[in-house]
Swiss-Prot record:
Region (Disordered): 1-29
UniProt keyword terms in alphabetical order: 4Fe-4S, Cytoplasm, Iron, Iron-sulfur, Metal-binding, S-adenosyl-L-methionine, Transferase
Family per record: Belongs to the radical SAM superfamily. Lipoyl synthase family.
Any Pfam family hit: Radical_SAM
Matches recorded under InterPro entries: Aldolase_TIM, Elp3/MiaA/NifB-like_rSAM, Lipoyl_synth, rSAM
Gene3D superfamilies, alphabetized: Aldolase class I (3.20.20.70)
Cofactor(s) in the UniProt record: [4Fe-4S] cluster
Binding site for [4Fe-4S] cluster 1: C80, C85, C91, S320
Cofactor binding description: Binds 2 [4Fe-4S] clusters per subunit. One cluster is coordinated with 3 cysteines and an exchangeable S-adenosyl-L-methionine.
Residues at which [4Fe-4S] cluster 2 binds: C106, C110, C113
Protein name per UniProt: Lipoyl synthase
Length: 333
């Protein structure tokens, strides 16, 4: 931990189980979500945010509200809103968004994430058409499509991704499409077979953290499986760039991050994002360190030395943040 990140001011409130009756169909967030996972969230001193952590408040310009109105009119969800992304004001203000398909209830309960958990609703058969119309209406040149985990579906939602990609290309043939997919655990080969029908322009799947912290941060996921997903997709689609992202601040070391980056390159991952983890609430995993800008710069330099075609590295970087610029600099658009 750097000296500038060591200013502890208060102790985070420990999570205690909610007294609300459990309803599997309701969307659980914050304490209602994290109190029921088999991972103990250990209270930690709340660190003072350093000067380099600056989040722009959501601005009320016309483009911001235009996007929100169009999304609601088409019954669409963005991960920007559901995950409480700190960059939502900037991105919506510039007319960009990351669309989240297959509902707003995830079958996983990752304690770093603010997306709600619950028994998902049936897939909306009109969503691919509504999504494609929205993208065309907004005249977007580059879009990111992501989703909740859908462990309840036999293909993990792969066919729904393909339907969204193909319909978007039909209405907006010049638009480049990046997908940020779940891990399709237990159905990987089936999902890859389906994605082969209509592959995206960029294939993204986040490793999120170092393998030592997977049990704590990504219950239900597997580090080796996530690497295999990207490597196997690349083997089938050698001309489609692959991408993955990491958070820092969960208790990892710099060397562990570098080791994950080496693993990424050994599994033919082309593009990289690294950003600072910011806890959505006191009921999520605590921030254990704020990484200094000099360290982010070191990660970026090492990334290019390792052969990544593009590395977006910095405190406020998120997987989809300025994804169009990342793709452009990597030669995709």
């Amino acid at each position: 931990m750097t000296d500038s990140a060591a200013g502890a001011t208060e102790v985070a409130t420990p999570a205690t189980p909610s007294n609300k009756p459990y309803d599997a169909t309701a969307k659980q967030k914050s304490l209602d979500k994290t109190a029921r996972i088999p991972i103990k969230i250990v209270p930690a001193e709340k660190l003072k945010k350093p000067d380099w952590i600056r989040v722009r408040a959501a601005t009320g310009n016309s483009r911001f509200y235009e996007i929100k109105d169009i999304l609601r009119a088409n019954n669409l969800v963005t991960v920007c809103e559901e995950a409480s992304c700190p960059n939502i004001g900037e991105c919506f203000g510039k007319g960009t968004a990351t669309f989240m398909i297959m509902g707003d209830k995830c079958t996983r309960r990752c304690p770093f994430c603010d997306v709600g958990h619950g028994r998902p609703d049936p897939l909306d058969v009109n969503e691919p058409e509504n999504l494609a119309k929205t993208i065309a209406e907004l005249k977007l040149n580059y879009v990111v499509i992501t989703s909740v985990d859908r462990d309840d579906l036999r293909d993990g939602g792969a066919q729904h991704y393909v339907d969204c990609i193909s319909r978007t290309r039909a209405l907006s043939p010049a638009t480049r499409i990046e997908v940020l997919v779940p891990d399709f655990r237990g159905r990987l080969e089936k999902a890859l077979d389906i994605l082969q029908e209509c592959p995206p322009d960029v294939m993204n799947h986040n490793l999120e953290t170092v393998p030592r912290l997977y049990k704590q941060a990504r219950p239900g996921a597997d580090y080796a499986h996530s690497l295999k997903l990207l490597k196997d997709f690349k083997a089938r689609n050698p001309n489609v760039p692959t991408k993955s992202g990491l958070m820092v601040g969960l208790g990892e070391t710099d060397e562990e991050i570098l080791e994950v980056m080496r693993d990424m390159r050994e599994h033919d991952i082309d593009m990289l994002t690294i950003g600072q983890y910011l806890a959505p609430s006191g009921h999520h995993l605590p921030v254990l360190r704020y990484v200094h800008p000099d360290t982010f710069k070191m990660f970026e330099e090492k990334a290019y030395e390792m052969g990544f075609t593009h590395a977006a590295v910095g405190a406020m970087v998120r997987s989809s943040y300025h994804a169009d610029q990342q793709a452009h600099e990597a030669g995709v658009v």
